[in-house]
């Protein structure tokens, strides 16, 4: 498996150099026509981060409601998403902003507990939740904007967490399947692009190893503020159930809806691109292991029905679950496209394997450090060459800025970030990667999880002190000019 990583790395280096050699050292200006004619440009959000209306119209609580409201000290500014951007009431304005900028797609997530307040069919379906998403989808289509719907973006219903531990319990696989079934049945006549899970790696790492995100579980030696958890075992159980939940969801879509609705179902995976810290053989192996425990962790089962060999070799003591032959067959090929959420890349350095205070973070025996540019192109090519050239969308890409309390609309650093990353996406396409679209994160400044409202990712400034008023930032105008056919840096 490691030799395959090196082969892929060589392909990437040679292909990248071939493109770069043909270009000027400075970043060329961009046109929309530099991308394929059917290339999709969109922006993304998630339900808990923007919707608000946490206790309105029958919505049940999620683990993020509990985590942020019961333990406000775990959020940097003590805030929560109970109101957030109030998109539940202001969705028409937000769709208007998408249209004004020129985006032709919107990636949003559906709140599980807004559809199923208690998380499962026994608790009943909330028609008001169905109505809200119908209204949002219809508004998007009326403006010529394609809906990309994410079924799960971290907001597990609290009732399922209480009943059997949420994604720690095998029961959640069927409950998620039933929830996805409702979404397909209710919205699939108009939604043609579905994402089952957003960043399962983040759920596993931050919710069950670091303990800094809901449900806030970890080993005590990792974070004394965690009330319970085991960073050596729970992450792998949760990851296993997430993968199986994805598999069951796409299985039900293909069985019941694919023929009539003709949609596509994928998954959004996050990872940086890890290069060796030095040219030593040890660091090269560490870089391969770092990829195995991040991107490959969730991609490999969808291609081969198995976990990466480096994970099998490194996770000692029977802590890594195994797939049955039936589950393995279900998972193989269980995607129509792969979403890539990319922000930055790092270097991986070999470190001794730990025998004490073991967690998922120590299992790769690699220290990931520093940041570097250029990783989005390399990660795309890695996915292309290693995983059978999948159809890909960049489902998230963006950068934050500190919230100062002032209305700041000039975000030149964000423009530079988007220009450079879009150019690298274009380079990957020229090499032959099958990338079909790009979604900026995020349309709006919003509740940024454990950071609360202390950072801003939006193309649109939201004034949280004045009725959630929206203002286009300079980066939004940059996208508008780009999408209207004008050259931009």
Curated annotation (Swiss-Prot):
Its EC number is 3.2.1.21. A beta-D-glucoside binds at residues 49, 153, 198-199, 343, 396, 441, 448-449, 457. SUPFAM superfamilies: (Trans)glycosidases (SSF51445). One of its GO terms (biological process) is pollen tube growth. One of its GO terms (molecular function) is beta-glucosidase activity. It is an enzyme of class 3 (hydrolase). The active site is at 199 (proton donor), 396 (nucleophile). Glycans are attached at residues 80, 225, 357. Disulfide bonds join 218-226. It catalyses: Hydrolysis of terminal, non-reducing beta-D-glucosyl residues with release of beta-D-glucose. Residues 1-21 form the signal peptide. PROSITE patterns: GLYCOSYL_HYDROL_F1_2. Keywords: Disulfide bond, Glycoprotein, Glycosidase, Hydrolase, Signal. The keyword Ligase does not apply. Pfam families: Glyco_hydro_1. Belongs to the glycosyl hydrolase 1 family. PANTHER family: BETA-GLUCOSIDASE 12-RELATED, GLYCOSYL HYDROLASE. This is Beta-glucosidase 14. The gene is BGLU14.
